[in-house]
Regions:
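Mature, function-bearing regions of proteins
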Residues: 1-254
Length: 254
């Protein structure tokens, strides 16, 4: 039995200041149980693992981004933070490659123990400069709604200052997914961002349906980012220069 799944839904962003800006796009994501990748490669006709296909997943798109095992990467970082890795299961919510291309602004690793309790969450954030930052949170209480907060440590948008705080609210994946991020500065809320989706099985039939609905989704994501940035610039929102160059940073937040 395959536990990995497809979630079809929407991404929403609303900026509150200095000017209101709103957009919404239809997307689909995969929630991949990392231990199933080889099985998915064999059983799902349109999906490949670390090789080209209509839809594919590559280890080098996440973690250390050097093609090494993501399970090993998660285990390594959990051990550094004294989080148990005994009999854990790891699921990753992300966009897949479509026709060999992907850009994931946010990927979420969900780590479960042998009792199916959520014990850690890793938020992996990327920007369009090829950089990545991962925020690691220990889950102290496994509720259906998980809430985390931290200061912003990574340059994402050139239209938002670094002196901000993130507030994450996520539902444990089930029939639906929900990932919500509120961003605040000292004067109040700047940005609301969310991804919502409804679950279907990850198999050849539903993957083909998802592709037909979104044949150029991953290309559209990167184009949409630049298009929305252009609209912010036209609205006169200040462009903030980026000074520090990083590759893969990781911070522990609790």
């Amino acid at each position: 039995m395959i536990n990995s799944s497809i979630y079809s839904g929407q991404v929403v962003h609303k900026r509150f200041k200095p000017k209101i800006h709103y957009f919404k796009y239809n997307v689909f994501s995969l929630l991949i149980e990392l231990s199933e990748l080889n099985q998915l490669d064999k059983k799902v006709n349109l999906f490949s693992y670390n090789r080209f296909n209509l839809v594919s997943f590559y280890d080098k798109d996440h973690g250390d981004r050097d093609g090494t095992s993501l399970i090993d990467w998660v285990n390594k970082n959990l051990k550094k933070n004294k989080i148990s890795t005994e009999n854990i299961r790891i699921k990753l919510l992300c966009y897949p490659r479509i026709l060999g291309f992907v850009f994931n602004p946010l990927s979420v690793f969900y780590v479960y123990d042998q009792s199916e309790q959520l014990i850690a969450i890793l938020y992996e954030v990327k920007n369009t400069f090829g950089e990545q930052h991962t925020y690691i949170f220990r889950v102290e209480k496994d509720n259906s709604l998980i809430q985390n907060s931290c200061s912003k440590k990574f340059h994402v948008s050139p239209f938002i200052e670094m002196k901000c705080n993130y507030f994450f609210r996520i539902l444990k994946p089930g029939n639906k997914i929900s990932v919500i991020i509120d961003q605040y500065d000292s004067e109040g809320k700047i940005l609301f961002a969310s991804q919502e989706g409804v679950r279907t099985d990850l198999n050849s039939k539903y993957l083909l349906k998802s592709y037909i609905k979104h044949p150029i989704m991953t290309f559209k994501i990167i184009l949409a980012i630049h298009y929305e940035a252009f609209k912010l610039w036209v609205k006169g929102i200040k462009f903030i220069k980026k000074n520090i160059k990083i590759k893969n940073n990781i911070t522990t937040e609790n």
